[in-house]
């Protein structure tokens, strides 16, 4: 049996009639409860009757069709309509507003909303994000349903913004956003308005690690914008989960009077790393490096080295290369993780590493850093002190972000009407 489907645009301003067909008023909005499952059920209608806005419960509706809503009985509750907690009005709160197309990792605007009768109730099942939705709302009802093809998104693949909805218990849900890569979420934040971006950040805050990853992916302007509104303790919580190099860059952009209070709230180890990085010019090797890296004794066996890699707390992107040092802790070699995995487990690192790897001192400028990375086709470049001890590593992606145009990785807008 084919599922009954309606579009919100075809219901708005429809006649509201009693069981006998007598006109009572008109439909002003459709009310749903977002918290109830993947496809939220219609809980009722907002109707305009005799100069008043009334609530019509879903259980009172016998017929719901384009242009006409018929009640199961003759009586209405003539109490004024009042929004209840967790309720959303589809016309007022969703239609014409932006939402997140999670499947496409971009913003879109709701041009129309599709309802279907399923499991004993009318439910929101889809959103039309095409530019033709507004046109359909302006056409006569009999023509609107036959307008050009729609771009319909499954409701389960979208997340509406609800920060503007006057209800104290409504929040954007974290579950759908957690499906996205931090860089995709950052793209959404940067394409959104400030309030929309703040709503995304608040939702992502349910996972502190993900929140920090998203902050790392934001451009500096947006990082400062959203950190500025947080207390010192809240700012420190975000910075504590970020890489020390990213945390130092962001901390340097905070107001002078906030830097030390926020820095003092960081865990001691992170605090020490950040203080060290802040002592370097941000456009030099010292300012670009990440103080978290893996440098092992060249006398170590491959089998033991692999165990160290597994135990390492470094992020996967920081573990592309393992460096080695001699008995005096002087940099002696470099080896790609892929080569380490394929090596004889009993071999010593000294026998398989690339000897005398390229390195730079902290005062090397950005052009020199970029030149060494490109000339030697490196993904990671060690930074050494005067004694040739490794003090940090520069990743190629950190340099790319500086030498390419600001929006180089955002070739496609995160906002689209599909």
State each model region's role:
Residues 18, 57-58, 63-73, 77-96, ...:
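Hydrophobic packing positions in regular secondary-structure scaffolds
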Residues 13-14, 30:
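Generic short beta-strand segments
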Residues 2-3, 19-22, 28-67, 120, ...:
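Basic, polyanion-binding surface patches
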Residues 9, 23, 38-40, 181-182:
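Short, surface-exposed loop/turn motifs at beta-strand boundaries within globular domains
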Residues 12-13, 96:
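A glycine-biased structural micro-motif
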Residues 24-25, 186:
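Short amphipathic alpha-helical segments
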């Amino acid at each position: 049996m084919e599922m009954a489907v309606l579009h919100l645009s075809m219901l708005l301003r429809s006649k509201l009639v009693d069981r006998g067909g007598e006109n009572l008023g008109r439909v002003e909005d459709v009310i749903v409860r977002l918290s109830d499952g993947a496809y939220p059920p219609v809980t009722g209608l907002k109707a305009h009757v005799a100069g008043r806005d009334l609530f019509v419960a879903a259980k009172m509706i016998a017929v719901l069709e384009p242009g006409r809503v018929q009640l199961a009985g003759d009586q209405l509750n003539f109490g004024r309509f009042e929004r209840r907690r967790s309720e959303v009005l589809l016309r007022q709160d969703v239609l014409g507003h932006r939402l997140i197309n999670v499947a496409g990792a971009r913003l879109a605007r709701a041009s129309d909303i599709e309802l279907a009768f399923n499991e004993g109730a009318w439910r929101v099942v889809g959103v039309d994000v095409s530019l033709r939705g507004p046109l359909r709302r302006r056409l006569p009802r009999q023509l609107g349903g036959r307008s050009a093809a729609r771009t319909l998104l499954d409701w389960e693949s979208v997340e509406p913004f609800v920060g503007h909805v006057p209800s104290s218990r409504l929040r954007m849900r974290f579950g759908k956003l957690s499906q996205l890569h931090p860089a995709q979420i950052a793209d959404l934040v940067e394409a959104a308005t400030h309030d929309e971006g703040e709503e995304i950040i608040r939702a992502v805050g349910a996972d502190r690690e993900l929140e920090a990853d998203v902050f790392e992916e934001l451009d500096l302007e947006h990082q400062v914008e959203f950190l500025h509104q947080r207390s010192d303790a809240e700012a420190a919580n975000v910075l504590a989960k970020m890489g020390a190099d990213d945390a130092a860059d962001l901390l340097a952009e905070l107001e002078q009077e906030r830097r030390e209070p926020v820095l003092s709230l960081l865990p001691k180890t992170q605090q020490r790393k950040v203080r060290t990085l802040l002592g370097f010019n941000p456009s030099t090797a010292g300012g670009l490096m990440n103080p978290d890296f893996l440098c092992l004794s060249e006398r170590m066996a491959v089998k033991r080295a692999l165990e160290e890699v597994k135990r390492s707390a470094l992020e996967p992107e920081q573990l592309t290369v393992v460096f080695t040092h001699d008995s005096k802790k002087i940099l002696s070699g470099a080896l790609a993780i892929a080569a380490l995995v394929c090596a004889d487990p009993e071999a010593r690192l000294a026998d398989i590493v690339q000897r005398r790897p390229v390195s730079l001192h902290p005062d090397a400028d950005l052009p020199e850093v970029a030149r060494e990375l490109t000339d030697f086709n490196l993904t990671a470049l060690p930074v050494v002190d005067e004694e040739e001890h490794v003090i940090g590593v520069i990743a190629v992606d950190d340099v790319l972000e500086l030498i390419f145009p600001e929006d180089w990785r955002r070739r496609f807008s995160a906002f689209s009407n599909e």
